[in-house]
């Protein structure tokens, strides 16, 4: 490497390490200011994610999710059956576990068993209490993690937890069925428009884009709704898109790794679904929580005061 290139590289490193933190929006053009802010947000979010040990928080949520997965799915399927679209929800669930049909059948069997025992005989009261307690426990842990990221000390009241979280549980099956209906509608239209050479590629693109749009909306809503503080939606949209895209990419990688899954089947046999589910949940929560860090840093970037004379920065949270 030539001396000139070394000097340029050294200058770039110095700029990214020190100088960029001293630049204010008034000193540069609007486009360059946006670019610099993006670098600051990415750097600070990674630092907060690692120093805050958010991976450990993701592991704790993975454990809570493992304990709560069957009760939550049981409630979703019970609501779906009440509205008469349990078959659509089951289809979506099976497609989500594509390549692991045995695991899907096992989980569906556990859901049916859970619903039967929760509403039969003397166990109906205990079963319902345990079901609601399990769900409240998971949602409390999720809110506590988001509040930790946002440095919020006060959680929701019990009344707000009951109303807010169970409203989500009522809406979630409807959203799943709506997404399934849109996908079926678009696919049907695509088959009928195969003769239209110009429109067919556009329709294919729209069908493939639907899961991404729904995932972007889900993460954006989560970042706005879950912390017990005011989160401006404009700061949640881009983190929601980034996290949603990463989540969808991981989904495709996870579903497409048939050789990887078969190796686990050879080692664990019928229990192979458990480590795979743990791995999927851990990575999914890590993606979700990093997006929450992005959202937090984006909204509070102006509250990081960077000294022009020193390399240190001070921070106050906007809550």
Predicted regions and their residues:
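Membrane-embedded alpha-helices and immediately adjacent juxtamembrane helical segments
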Residues: 2-317
């Amino acid at each position: 490497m030539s001396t000139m290139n070394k000097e340029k590289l050294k200058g770039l490193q110095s700029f990214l390490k020190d100088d960029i933190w001293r630049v204010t929006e008034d000193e540069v053009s609007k486009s360059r200011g946006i670019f610099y802010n993006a670098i600051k947000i990415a750097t600070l979010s990674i630092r907060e994610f690692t120093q805050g040990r958010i991976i450990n928080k993701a592991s704790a949520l993975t454990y809570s999710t493992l304990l709560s997965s069957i009760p939550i799915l049981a409630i979703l399927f019970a609501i779906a059956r009440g509205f008469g679209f349990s078959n659509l929800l089951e289809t979506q669930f099976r497609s989500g576990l594509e390549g692991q049909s045995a695991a899907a059948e096992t989980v569906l069997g556990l859901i049916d068993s859970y619903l039967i025992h929760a509403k039969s005989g003397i166990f109906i009261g205990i079963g319902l209490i345990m079901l609601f307690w399990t769900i409240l426990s998971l949602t409390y842990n999720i809110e506590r993690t988001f509040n930790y990221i946002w440095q919020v000390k006060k959680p929701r009241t019990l009344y707000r937890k009951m109303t807010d979280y169970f409203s989500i549980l009522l809406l979630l099956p409807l959203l799943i069925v709506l997404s399934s209906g849109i996908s079926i509608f678009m696919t049907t239209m695509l088959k009928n428009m195969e003769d239209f050479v110009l429109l067919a590629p556009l329709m294919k693109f729209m069908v493939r884009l639907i899961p991404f749009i729904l995932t972007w909306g889900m993460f954006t809503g989560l970042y706005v709704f879950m912390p017990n503080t005011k989160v401006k939606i404009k700061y949640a949209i881009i983190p929601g898109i980034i996290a949603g895209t990463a989540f969808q990419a991981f989904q495709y990688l996870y579903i497409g790794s048939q050789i990887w899954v078969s190796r686990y089947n050879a080692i664990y046999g019928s229990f192979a679904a458990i480590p795979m589910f743990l791995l999927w949940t851990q990575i999914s929560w890590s993606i979700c929580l990093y997006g929450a860090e992005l959202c937090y840093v984006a909204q509070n970037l102006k509250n990081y005061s960077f000294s022009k004379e020193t390399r240190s920065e001070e921070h106050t949270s906007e809550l």
